[in-house]
């Protein structure tokens, strides 16, 4: 059964950095969730306007469908970056064919802010952090996953991530 790892958290938490490092270790398909947004969603976020549930649903469904397609093609693992802020959003992703795990990156907020302020050319702005924090719901008991609070270097975070993956007995 395909093991899907959703690297989740608010903007600037390091999702892409961790996902790319995981992809190098697991040699599996990787989807950058930002690439699945419509231009309208990107424009909205770029203007500092938070997305609503209606904006997010088709985006989440496209990610879910990509995950299921990878499972149908025999992928052992997949890695997806996605904020996955609400339980209801994660429920959509959990409909994918295979087993879905959430790796919630939750470094201190100042680390997120610093990363966001140093980004060049990304549509998300540091001003979006608060709206994402307001929306964020912690993982629930019915959701498989781990919360990683480290603000360390990417390789330190990867040790924790791979510890979780290996504990699943599926690496």
Give residue ranges: language-model regions:
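Walker A (P-loop) ATP-phosphate-binding motif of ABC ATPase nucleotide-binding domains
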Residues: 4
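Hydrophobic anchor at the beta1->P-loop junction of P-loop NTPases
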Residues: 7
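The conserved Walker
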Residues: 11
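Conserved lysine of the Walker
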Residues: 15
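Conserved substrate/cofactor phosphate-moiety recognition/catalytic segment
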Residues: 20-62
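Glycine-rich phosphate-binding loop used to anchor ATP phosphates in small-molecule kinases
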Residues: 54-97, 105
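Conserved phosphate-donor/acceptor-positioning beta-strand/loop module used by diverse small-molecule
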Residues: 96-115
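Small-molecule kinase domains that catalyze NTP-dependent phosphoryl transfer to phosphate-bearing small molecules
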Residues: 118-160
């Amino acid at each position: 059964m395909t093991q899907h790892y959703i690297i989740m958290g608010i903007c600037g938490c390091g999702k892409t950095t961790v996902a790319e490092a995981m992809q190098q270790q697991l040699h599996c398909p990787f989807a950058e969730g930002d690439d699945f947004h419509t231009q309208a969603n990107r424009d909205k976020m770029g203007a500092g306007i938070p997305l609503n549930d209606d904006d997010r649903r088709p985006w989440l469904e496209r990610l879910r469908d990509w995950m299921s397609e990878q499972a149908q093609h025999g992928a052992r693992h997949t890695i997806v970056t996605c904020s996955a802020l609400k339980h209801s959003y994660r429920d959509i992703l959990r409909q994918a064919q295979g087993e879905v795990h959430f790796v919630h990156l939750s470094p201190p907020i100042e680390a997120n802010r610093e990363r966001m302020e140093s980004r060049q050319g990304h549509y998300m702005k540091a001003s979006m952090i608060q709206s994402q924090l307001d929306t964020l719901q912690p993982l629930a008991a019915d959701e498989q996953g781990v919360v990683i609070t480290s603000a360390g270097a990417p390789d330190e975070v990867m040790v924790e991530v791979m510890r979780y993956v290996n504990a699943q007995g599926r690496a």
